[in-house]
């Protein structure tokens, strides 16, 4: 019965997302909330200038409303779901402010890096203080084994790193039409299966609400995109997936299931270090998806390849997290 409930959860979130998007996109156009395209980006992206952004609000509303209603309906509105809603709201709010400054105040960089970091830190600290001992404990598990290591207060540092790093890594992935929507749906789908295996049904409901919401958004975000999610969506999704991994005690497994996000982030780190130390670039452009674009791949080919990689990594993660 619960399995059907999870499918219903995804279905409801999908329908809300699909229903809201056609109403919200013209509203964004009317407000002239269009995406600015950086001059240093791929030239093929210049035609996307003016495409409505902040569409992440649709994802945000769809998954928050659905997960809350379904968690109440199935009596799983506990500490875990409450924490996930807190993180999603907090990081989504930071993303919203960042987008708002970019498109309304016409300040291309949005929030300063310090402002964004302070906001991310506040949410991460609140998550740790509220959840410690109630929704999660301060040890990590080796994936596929019963081996655990108690970290004590060092776990606090890990939580900060995961939430801040996770939100930024997912944000970096949001650079091509449909790329993040698809990879996020795959990753949250994998974690929902692990959550069911652990009988963490509240977390599973939340994950399936995200899956439905991003797939509904993908209908309008696939190439050629009619709307972008902006930081409103990407930061919320990044914070949420890191929080899910923490609550399921699959902190290390996030590196595999979120492997696409990790690769995107590493490409940026490698590029910066290489250029600062040698004056040479390893990639034609970072994050990694832009490198393949400049190698002559079509945008759709890059997106499908990254989706495929995300799917294979998700299957590996499920195998380790459930069957091993």
UniProtKB/Swiss-Prot annotation:
Give one GO molecular function term: UDP-N-acetylmuramoyl-L-alanyl-D-glutamyl-meso-2,6-diaminopimelyl-D-alanyl-D-alanine:undecaprenyl-phosphate transferase activity
Reactions catalysed: UDP-N-acetyl-alpha-D-muramoyl-L-alanyl-gamma-D-glutamyl-meso-2,6-diaminopimeloyl-D-alanyl-D-alanine + di-trans,octa-cis-undecaprenyl phosphate = di-trans,octa-cis-undecaprenyl diphospho-N-acetyl-alpha-D-muramoyl-L-alanyl-D-glutamyl-meso-2,6-diaminopimeloyl-D-alanyl-D-alanine + UMP
Alphabetized, the UniProt keywords read: Cell cycle, Cell division, Cell membrane, Cell shape, Cell wall biogenesis/degradation, Magnesium, Membrane, Metal-binding, Peptidoglycan synthesis, Transferase, Transmembrane, Transmembrane helix
Protein's membrane topology: Multi-pass membrane protein
Record-listed E.C. numbers: 2.7.8.13
Q: Which Pfam families match?
A: Glycos_transf_4, MraY_sig1
Note the coiled coil stretches, chain numbering.
none
Cited function:
Catalyzes the initial step of the lipid cycle reactions in the biosynthesis of the cell wall peptidoglycan: transfers peptidoglycan precursor phospho-MurNAc-pentapeptide from UDP-MurNAc-pentapeptide onto the lipid carrier undecaprenyl phosphate, yielding undecaprenyl-pyrophosphoryl-MurNAc-pentapeptide, known as lipid I.
Query: Which HAMAP family does UniProt cross-reference here?
Result: MraY
Please state what the protein is called.
Phospho-N-acetylmuramoyl-pentapeptide-transferase
Query: What organism does the record attribute this protein to?
Result: Bacillus cereus (strain ATCC 14579 / DSM 31 / CCUG 7414 / JCM 2152 / NBRC 15305 / NCIMB 9373 / NCTC 2599 / NRRL B-3711)
- What is this organism's lineage? Bacteria, Bacillati, Bacillota, Bacilli, Bacillales
């Amino acid at each position: 019965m619960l399995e059907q409930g999870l499918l219903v959860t995804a279905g409801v979130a999908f329908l809300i997302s699909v229903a809201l998007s056609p109403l919200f996109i013209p509203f964004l156009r009317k407000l002239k909330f269009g995406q600015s395209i950086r001059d240093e980006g791929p030239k093929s992206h210049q035609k996307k200038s003016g495409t409505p952004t902040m569409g992440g609000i649709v994802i945000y509303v769809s998954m928050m409303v659905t997960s809350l209603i379904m968690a109440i309906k199935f009596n799983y509105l506990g500490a875990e779901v409450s924490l996930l809603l807190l993180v999603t709201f907090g990081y989504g709010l930071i993303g919203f402010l960042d987008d708002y400054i970019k498109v309304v105040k016409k300040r291309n960089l949005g929030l300063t890096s310090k402002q964004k970091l302070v906001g991310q830190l506040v949410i991460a600290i609140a998550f740790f203080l509220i959840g410690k001992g109630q929704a999660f404990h301060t040890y990590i598990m080796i994936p596929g084994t019963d081996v655990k290591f108690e970290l004590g207060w060092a776990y606090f540092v890990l939580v900060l790193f995961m939430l801040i790093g996770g939100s930024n890594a997912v944000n970096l992935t949001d650079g091509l039409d449909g790329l993040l929507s698809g990879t996020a749906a795959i990753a949250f789908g994998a974690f929902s299966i692990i959550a069911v295996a652990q009988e963490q049904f509240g977390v599973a409901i939340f994950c399936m609400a995200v899956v439905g919401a991003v797939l509904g958004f993908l209908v309008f975000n696939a190439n050629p995109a009619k709307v972008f999610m902006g930081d409103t969506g990407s930061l919320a999704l990044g914070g949420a997936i890191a929080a899910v991994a923490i609550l399921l005690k699959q902190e290390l497994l996030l590196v595999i299931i979120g492997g696409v996000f990790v690769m995107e982030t590493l490409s940026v780190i490698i590029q910066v270090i290489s250029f600062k130390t040698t004056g040479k670039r390893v990639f034609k452009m970072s994050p990694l998806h832009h490198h393949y674009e400049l190698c002559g791949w079509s945008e759709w080919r890059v997106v499908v390849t990254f989706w495929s990689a995300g799917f294979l990594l998700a299957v590996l993660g499920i195998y380790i997290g459930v069957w091993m």
